[in-house]
Regions:
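Short regulatory helix/loop adjacent to the ATP-binding pocket of P-loop NTPases
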Residues: 63-66, 166-181, 190
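C-terminal alpha-helical "lid" subdomain
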Residues: 177, 194, 198-266
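Conserved NTP-binding/hydrolysis module of P-loop NTPases
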Residues: 8-13, 70-73, 81-100
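Conserved AAA+ ATPase "SRH/arginine-finger" region at the nucleotide-binding site
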Residues: 76-80, 170, 183-196
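Mid-core helix/loop region of P-loop NTP-binding domains shared across ATPases and GTPases
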Residues: 3, 82-85, 97-141, 150-154, ...
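Sensor-1/coupling segment of RecA-like P-loop NTPase cores
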Residues: 49, 57, 104-109, 133-141, ...
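Walker A/P-loop nucleotide-binding motif
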Residues: 41-61
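A short, basic N-terminal segment
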Residues: 1-41, 266
């Protein structure tokens, strides 16, 4: 296998790294700061990015860092369905038996959220991943979950995570009530050219290899092909290393990188 050819102790360039392996890019640090603020001050947050930019990873690492005695994470990965389906998913995350009608569901969820805050001293954080797929009626339900009569307390924190389409959707007049509530937002960018070099070195070292395996031309070609998007970088790097091992080459050069980019469809 190509891992043993290069002497790796484990497979590098995983799309699901543990927190210790996360690369602290400038963009990642910006997201981290905003999510920490959101956890402390509550409200609504928005994180967007291209496919593979690391949005879901950012949300996962953020929630893993929280004290489970103080926070309850409600994670909804909504790919299709109606507003009623979304509310049912949220109710299930709250360990509720979902009511049959929309109005009853909203009241049911709101009541559970208040009880969590007041009785268990837990603050719920609702994360809507792939939120760009939410239909308009579903998005219109979210402000209702943030209203608690005349009480100004922020009993529920909402984090919307999705592709750039989500920003365009939220710019519509029908979603002004939700848009005005957004207190923190950030668009997650890819790695810069310098960060790409550092990222490659970090991933190799974490897998047990200290010497560089990508020459200058390969690294430049990788940046041009991936624009620094982490998932694309990981895919291309693994493909290039596999092809290099097959060719008995100890390094990835431009020619190997170009073949890898074609195979990885980048």
């Amino acid at each position: 296998m190509w891992e043993s050819f290069f002497g790796f102790k484990k497979t590098p360039f995983s799309d699901s790294p543990d927190a210790k392996q996360l690369f602290a890019s400038q963009s990642w640090n910006q997201v981290k700061t905003r999510l920490e603020f959101l956890a402390q001050h509550h409200g609504v947050g928005l994180i967007t990015g291209e496919v593979g930019a690391g949005k879901s990873t950012a949300a996962r690492v953020f929630t893993a860092s929280l004290n489970t005695n103080l926070y309850k994470i409600l994670y909804v990965h909504f790919s299709s369905g109606s507003a009623l389906d979304l509310l049912r998913q949220i109710a299930l995350e709250l360990d509720l038996e979902p009511a049959h009608f929309r109005g009853d569901l909203v009241r049911q969820i709101s009541g559970a959220v208040v009880r969590l805050n007041q009785s268990k001293k837990q603050h719920p954080i609702l994360i809507c991943d792939e939120a760009h797929l939410l239909p308009h009626p579903a998005l219109e339900q979210l402000p209702l979950l943030l209203n608690f009569d005349m009480d100004s307390s922020r009993y529920l924190t909402l984090l919307l995570v999705g592709q750039p389409l989500l920003r365009r959707t939220l710019s519509l007049q029908m979603h002004e009530a939700l848009r005005q509530r957004i207190g923190v937002q950030y668009h997650l960018e890819g790695l810069t050219r310098d960060e790409l070099d550092a990222y490659l070195a970090q991933q190799l070292k974490a897998a047990g290899v200290s010497q560089p395996l990508f020459d200058d031309t390969a690294r430049q070609g990788m940046y041009q092909a991936t624009k620094g998007i982490p998932r694309k970088v990981n895919k291309l790097a693994m493909t290039a290393l596999r092809l290099a091992a097959g060719a008995k080459s100890q390094t990835v050069n431009e020619a190997i990188l170009l073949d890898a980019a074609a195979e990885a469809m980048l």
